[in-house]
Amino acid sequence: RTRKMTKKLGARTMPDYFEKRYGSKGMKILAAVIIFVFLVPYSAAVYKGLGSLFGAVFPGVESWVWMLIIACLTALYLVAGGYIATAYTDLIQGIITIVGVVCLVCAVLGHDAVGGVTGLIENLKNFQSVPGDPNPTTGAQLTNMFGGSSFRFLCFNIMLTSFGTWGLPQMIGKFYAIKDTAAIKRGTIISTIFCIVIGCGAYLIGSTSRLVLGGVLPKGGVDSVIPTLLMKILGGGTAGIILLALIMILLLSASMSTLEAVVLTSASSVAVDLIPAVRKKETKPEA
């Protein structure tokens, strides 16, 4: 329905859709401002996560250096190819992400502290929080479907990341590029499979962090849990270094995929919607 309506109205962006659908230029300007203002901290959070990750793996290099490199790479193919570039890179990065998640799940389950699929449940049952654990939890809570002190937060997080994304401007913008009804059916099946594998893999990896790290929060806080987990599992040996490099590419791909969509959407809200609307209003001849 979104694609049909935008094609009928000739809308290119979400603010443009609001103006043509409801005949309100003020709504267009307001939507463009909201999108730009709130997507900036969104992208900042992605940069911070990447900076923490690369800073943990390469402690000799400052985090801001990695942020600058990632920003330049993202800007390079966005400027060169626009939306077509993001579509192709999303496909490639999606394949890298799903391969990386599968490899990481296998590596985590194979760790001595986890002990495979069967050992994971048994070890979690026997888990005891160490003194100073910021979120003390018993083994019974960790293996109970409705247990654990973070159960409510987990449910909220799953709902937010599963259904909240439907209304994100950068996600809705992808609907505008749908070719036909057949593409919708194929895309629904493929994206569902990808989301199930990646989502379940991410939550499974997170659930093993207490076992691998012994319930001790790393020096960098919660943002350093996954980087520390990766270093502890994959830090030694040639195979470990190769797998760690693959995981780094996976995380970089996932983050850059998000960044490119956010940057393209926020930039278009200013360049396509906000600036032309304001200029037209300023240059409008007086009666």
Residue positions per predicted region:
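Short amphipathic alpha-helical coupling elements at transmembrane boundaries
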Residues: 4-7, 16-23, 52-56, 122, ...
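Loop-to-helix junctions at membrane interfaces in multi-pass transport proteins
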Residues: 19, 95-245
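Helix-loop-helix module between adjacent transmembrane segments
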Residues: 1-78, 157-164, 251-263
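Loop-to-transmembrane helix boundary motifs in multi-pass membrane proteins
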Residues: 21-29, 68, 268-287
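Hydrophobic core positions of alpha-helical segments in small-molecule transporters
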Residues: 30, 66-70, 89-92, 187-190
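Structural signature of transmembrane alpha-helix termini at the membrane-water interface
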Residues: 1, 41-51, 76-83, 102-113, ...
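Transmembrane helix-bundle signature of multi-pass membrane transporters/permeases
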Residues: 90, 94, 188-196, 250-254, ...
